[in-house]
Amino acid sequence: MTPVTPRPPIERRLADAGLPPLPRTAWLEIDLDALAGNLAALRGVAGTGVPVRPVVKADAYGHGAVPVALALEAAGADGFCVAAFDEAIELREGGVRAPILILYPVPVAFVGEAAGRGIAVAAGDDHGLAETIRAASGLDPARPLHVELEIETGLGRGGFAVAEVAAAARLVAASRGLELAGLWTHFQAVDDPSITAAQVAAYDAAIDAIALAGIGLPVRHVAASGALMTDGMLAYDGVRPGLAVYGLVPDELASARLPAALSGLRPVMSLVARPVRVVELPTGTGISYGPSFRTARPSRIATLPLGYADGWARAHSNRASAIVRGGRVPLVGNVAMDAVMADVTDVAGPPVDTTDEFVLLGASGDERITAAELAQERTTISWEIVTGMSRRLPRVYHAAAGPVGLRTLTERRG
């Protein structure tokens, strides 16, 4: 085990950067240099001149939508994708100026505001499109609502059937206040080439139908992270990576051979905590509610101030570990709403105390705890690990020089 040099306390690092202290000693660290590097790597795979529109829905996969989008915009992102209207508005009000696409239907009450703020909307069925056309009929043709048609190619979740796409495109092209801006689909299983090939064939058939109808082809895009990692030829006119922007590989591709350009993807998020208490407990002491764990010897137990209300799921009880001083220690007892306990009895050196930092997600020394590892512990996927990190966990944004911003429930800096 490589010895780890302790960092200055988070309070000092923030103060040195002119930032206020955190309201608690559990926080997420978001590496903006890694974020920019990941975007550059994905752009390299997509190809020269292919627009990259990162997906920043779900609070940028738990990383913080506005700070992440602003950093990506500064790094050259061509636009962004979100899932809901208020997610798009949050970006605009946070200062994001790049184009935004909402990937799910938008209530017609917000059509006018979407057009006025330069936010594109998706349409994937006749009823929803008809309502959007009616709502947009009074819009200024000089500032039309951009509409992107979703095509059902096999995911079974939404979109126009291939046979319906040309008619839908005609309606949009002929409607006052609307502009046909895109044509997209989403893949079901990028690790299965036969399924993906069938979806690509269906998508290409839809493109051909629109071309035969004499309608100018809009921007075509199909590739999220998985498709971009497995087949860069699917870039078409743009790509919309999600998980990979944050340095993570889709779980189904964990053993796949990825493009060399993506070998340097770096996880952006780390979860760090300092104990609020470290105490010696006698043999037979029950730890946390239940209790599902009792000390088998005199033990030194550290209480970390985060729990299932923060996204550290109860399913991690007696399964997970943390890294302290470069080595792993077990997390013991049932995860509580606001606390989880670590057994630090065997940590070498001076007794662990409340100045020690614990890494629950991320790297320290030679050790790394990945989102994929945590996902396996709770029988889920990496997406759920990062998106499940609660808003009440402070986010500290940093670059090579140290902290450059933070977000808590009460303020955002940087």
PLM regions: where:
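Active-site anion/phosphate-binding pocket segments in diverse small-molecule metabolic enzymes
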Residues: 1-32, 36, 40, 44, ...
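Active-site-proximal beta-alpha core segment in soluble small-molecule metabolic enzymes
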Residues: 9-13, 21-22, 26-37, 48-222, ...
